[in-house]
Amino acid sequence: MPLLSFDSLSSQLPTSWKSSVVGQVGPARIKVLRMDEQAHAEESHDYNEALLVTHGCLRLGIAGREVTVSAGQMYLVEAGLPHAVLPGSHGTLVIIDV
């Protein structure tokens, strides 16, 4: 895999909250997206999802509580766990799903 700048890649994406696959390591897909202030409805997946913020912050609603993930932090969403994006998230998000 070549050297990647997640912040640079996300700034080039035409649409916020639409991820782009930038690589794969074994079964894990690595995606990047640009966050904006919008909220997004609750969702869940049948796979684990690591949410790594490289710039800005991600505000999540999980099990009735708010979790803020800051730059340099990662939140692991276990398979089947409902989670929503709360208003005010912004920056660059790297998603690793297995």
Please name every model-derived segment.
Residues G26, T54-H55, S70-A71, S89:
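A cytosolic small-molecule/anion-sensing beta-strand core signal
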Residues M1-L33:
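A short, N-terminal "cap"/entry segment at the start of jelly-roll beta-barrel domains
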Residues A79-V98:
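Ligand-binding loop in jelly-roll beta-barrel domains
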Residues G64-G80:
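Short acidic-glycine-tyrosine-enriched beta hairpin
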Residues K18, A28, D36, R65, ...:
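A generic "binding-loop/recognition-motif" signal
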Residues R29-H45:
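Conserved short histidine dyad/triad with adjacent acidic residue
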Residues E37, Y47-R59, A63:
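Glycine- and acidic-residue-biased ligand/ion/polar-headgroup-sensing regions
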